[in-house]
Amino acid sequence: MGHVDREDLLNVIRHELRLEDDDGPGLCSRLLLNPDRKCRAGGLPLDFRLKNGDLMDDGDAGFDDIYEIPLYEEPIHTRTLINDSLALRTAEKIKEEGRRDNFYTGPLDELFVKQEVNWPPKTPISTEKSAIERYLEENSANLNNPLGEYSKFAATTTDPSRQIEIIIPMSCDEEIGFKTLKIEVLTTARIREVIGYCLLQYYLTFDSYLPGEVDDYQFYLAEEDGEIEHELPPLDSSKLVGQVGFTCLGLVSRIKKNGNSRQKRAVAVWFVDKDQYVIEVDNMEKPLRWLRDEAFRLREETVKEREPLFQGLLDIKEYYMEAVDNFDVKLDLEASISSARSLEFVMIRKNSSRAGFHPRGGRYGRQMSAMLTLKMPNSPIAAGPMTPLPTVMEESPAVAGTSNGFGFPKAESCGAIASTPGVTWNDDGGQLSSFIVQRIHKFKPKWKANLIFRWTCFEIEKYREDRSAFLPQGYQKHTKVPWEYVGGVRTQLKDAKAGRVDMWQITFFWLPVLSDETVKDVIGDAEWNLNLVAKIYANEEKWRSVTLETFFKQDVDEIFSQTNSILQARDASIYKAFSHSSFGTLSPAASADLALMESAEAIVSPSSDAPSRSSNGKNGGKFRKMSSLMASVMGRRKSDSK
């Protein structure tokens, strides 16, 4: 028995019986829903019209009426159908419009416009000058002047500035004793830059150049009447103008003042890879940046000769400098070489460290740097940041021929350095070095001794065994002096005779060591200074000394270098006083007075916040008093020497 389900019945009514009901009353349309709304989206293929296109010619019958839905539809890719449809529509559109390509078939000359060109072009003759020509004529003095780079330090209306009167002494041949020049410069300019600006303004004002270069001149304190204080030290070329409160300065040529050319010094620059470059410096007032650039130049020349394969590589030049004896203290590249108080430097790459690198090995490394700045109990000075380092870099053949016997000028020996927290040692410190010498006595025979340098003192003790001695050696005196009481050392060649080996003499100068009770009663908790030295040792007529002898020049240089390095690092008041005693010819009190006068710049100079229009009358009286006092002391020195 057959069975017809509901869906089959509906399909028959929709697709078969409905065709017979079209001409009738439309009962099926009213009872059944529209099949278009019920059919599945995409149920018919896209080409169902084209497949039965041959039936189109029979009449106007619709395509939908005769399409048969297949039982199974194969998937059809629509890409080819869409492309064919688009191509057909495009072809029909082109055919309808009747478009044709517009190509030019005429001569090519008609496409261009002919124009006559006259070369070279004729320049119009004009008597008026352009703005560039007028600017070059107005500023030709600055543009062609070798000192034109210093014009940028001129005062402006927006930045803080300072007005200074410059006294320029003239030669004896001219009728005018000096010339004055008023300048106004930025407070951020350094002294060496102000000197260059003065030379530029001198040329623009008087239409003549001053002889020499910028490095040949120094600033001294002066007064408005033309008097220059030559007794006082010159201003540090690395200082800023804002740090100097004087409104009247004297521009003095150091070559004319000294009567000869500048003495060259050898400065060594080390890299961490142990490359060393020795640079001759004729002026220690040059900035450290110049020294760094010279080291880079020498390094590049060496690399080209030694490692030609690395010529094309880019070398990173971001380095900073440290003194060889001072670890972890960056130097200001704009400061002068003399302000570093060292003749050897280390180049360290930025964001890096030299660790324990030292050119002379481990015993001069970071541990020595920390130990040599310690403060002993009852020490006259606080610990300083400088670390002593043996160095003999002077090109002078005789060590004792320097200005004060310490390897650097007097003006450099009194510079103040910042103090660091002190550390206390309970023992006498370890041994740094030792030398075998002969101790000289005024009345007794000389005897063989050991000169020992320790962290806190130097000692002269009897040599362990001396079988060559004829007399009994019970008179040898053990000498031990802390570094704080040592004034200095002097080396000299003994009277040389033909056919005899050179004998060198080393003389140490010091002051009596005070007892703990004296230090506690007289000084107390106060810091040692030159005033206390002059007060405590007022009854001392001369410096105590001991003389040693040796045949070895290398040992002499090492003793001289190590002693000066240690004293320079500690920078004690007794050391400052001795540097003004002419190697012990003046008494300790007189030497301390001279040292006080030389350091008077720090006392009388006003602060940087003081107004720049302060009068020079008050300071002028102080300068005259100091000059007269120094003249009297110098006269006393001459009488004592006679």
Swiss-Prot record:
Residue spans with biased composition (Low complexity)?
605-615
Enumerate the residue ranges of region (Disordered).
Answer: 603-642
Gene Ontology process terms (BP): mesendoderm development; TORC2 signaling
Do the record's keywords include Glycosyltransferase? no
Disulphide bridges: none
Any GO MF annotation of the entry: phosphatidylinositol-4,5-bisphosphate binding
Give all residue intervals belonging to the CRIM domain. 189-314
List the keywords (alphabetical). Stress response
What InterPro entries does this protein's entry cite?
CRIM_dom (IPR031567), Sin1/Avo1 (IPR008828), Sin1_N (IPR032679)
What family does the database annotate? Belongs to the SIN1 family.
**Subunit note:** Component of the target of rapamycin complex 2 (TORC2).
**Function description:** Component of the target of rapamycin complex 2 (TORC2), which transduces signals from growth factors to pathways involved in proliferation, cytoskeletal organization and anabolic output. In response to growth factors, TORC2 phosphorylates and activates AGC protein kinase family members, such as Akt1. Within the TORC2 complex, sinh-1 acts as a substrate adapter which recognizes and binds AGC protein kinase family members for phosphorylation by mTor.
Q: What is this protein called?
A: Stress-activated map kinase-interacting protein 1 homolog
Its gene name is sinh-1
